[in-house]
């Protein structure tokens, strides 16, 4: 525990010394990214909020999720590459020649059960509990991830102690009775993210967490790798980076000069680390929700952007 406390203290001091390091997001800046939460499948709006939270996405094509599953690729796509696919933004996931292996929708609803990509369900937040329980066993997956940025007021917004009963009631039985692999809550890269997770882990030693989920936004590969390494060494578990991009939320006037270069360096490092199981660049969507449009993997017509092709194919 002394080692854990020291690591957290050093991490917090480093972030305070440089707000940009590790992609720290203050609440006002984070709000500009919008709510990454499931949207109505019938909505044509590109906003990130929905008038209802109980609608599930539908596919408009039987070819949804047509990216082939790779066999041990070490390229920029590779078997670690994933897609964050916001529900309702498009009816299908693009067919492409890349090698991504999985996707999530910030929800319990897959785009198309039985498709080529592995679906990872996300229990987005407390208000999704009934929806989660009603659908998780029919979602065509054995992977479940916990709350989305719970320490952020504009996201799932729940303190760590209050989150523990939700895990015990809605997550743990999936592991114990159905053999699911379970991922932690995915906190933002604010300094309080690791504090939230530390409190949760201490309060719930009986919670079976198979891998740690995390989000990161910043502008240097060194800061990114330092942050991911910190989570691995602190919790001694494998890592899923379910959101990351080259984005400065602290100073919006200082964005990445070379997004493709950042992606190339970050993805190459992720793919070379045995403890990193999967990653998903933000984002595969038309509306980038306050993130630099240069980070977008999708053009406005729904086709892959040049960066999108780099991510899934390089």
Q: Residue ranges of each PLM-predicted region?
A:
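Aromatic- and acid-rich polysaccharide-binding/catalytic face
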Residues: 148, 197-249, 282-283
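Extracellular mucin-like PTS domains
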Residues: 40-70
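Loop/turn elements at helix/coil->beta-strand transitions in domains of secreted/extracellular proteins
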Residues: 77-81, 98-102, 115-119, 139-143, ...
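N-terminal carbohydrate-binding/catalytic regions of secreted carbohydrate-active enzymes
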Residues: 76-145, 157-158, 169
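Fungal secretory targeting signals
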Residues: 1-36
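Alpha-helical scaffolding within the catalytic cores
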Residues: 88-90, 103-111, 125-137, 167-170, ...
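Active-site groove signature of glycoside hydrolases
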Residues: 138-160, 181-191, 207-216, 240-241, ...
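Substrate-binding cleft of secreted/luminal carbohydrate-active enzymes
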Residues: 103, 143, 255-314
């Amino acid at each position: 525990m002394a080692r854990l406390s020291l690591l957290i203290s050093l991490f917090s001091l480093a972030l305070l010394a440089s707000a940009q390091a590790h992609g720290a997001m203050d609440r006002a800046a984070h709000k500009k990214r919008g709510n990454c939460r499931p949207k109505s499948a019938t909505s044509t709006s590109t906003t990130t909020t929905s008038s209802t939270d109980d609608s599930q996405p539908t596919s408009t094509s039987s070819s949804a999720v047509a990216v082939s599953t790779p066999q041990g690729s070490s390229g920029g796509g590779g078997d670690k590459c994933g897609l964050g696919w916001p529900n309702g933004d498009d009816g299908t996931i693009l067919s492409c020649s890349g090698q991504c292996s999985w996707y999530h929708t910030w929800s319990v609803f897959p785009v198309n059960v039985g498709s080529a990509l592995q679906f990872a369900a996300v229990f987005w937040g407390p208000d999704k509990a009934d929806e989660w329980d009603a659908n998780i066993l029919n979602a065509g997956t054995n992977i479940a991830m916990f709350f989305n940025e719970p320490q952020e007021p504009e996201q799932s917004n729940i303190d760590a102690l209050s989150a523990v009963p939700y895990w015990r009631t809605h997550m743990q039985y999936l592991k114990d009775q159905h053999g699911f692999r379970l991922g932690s809550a995915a906190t933002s890269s604010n300094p309080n993210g690791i504090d939230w997770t530390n409190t949760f882990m201490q309060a719930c030693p009986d919670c079976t967490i198979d891998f740690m989920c995390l989000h990161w936004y910043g502008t240097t590969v060194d800061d990114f790798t330092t942050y991911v390494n910190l989570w691995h060494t602190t919790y001694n578990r494998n890592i899923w980076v379910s959101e990351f991009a080259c984005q400065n939320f602290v100073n919006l006037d200082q964005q990445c000069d070379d997004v493709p270069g950042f992606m190339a360096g970050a993805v190459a490092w992720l793919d070379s680390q045995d403890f990193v199981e999967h990653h998903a660049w933000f984002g595969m969507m038309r509306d980038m929700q306050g993130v630099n449009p240069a980070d977008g993997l999708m053009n406005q017509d729904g086709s892959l952007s040049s960066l999108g092709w780099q991510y899934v194919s390089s």
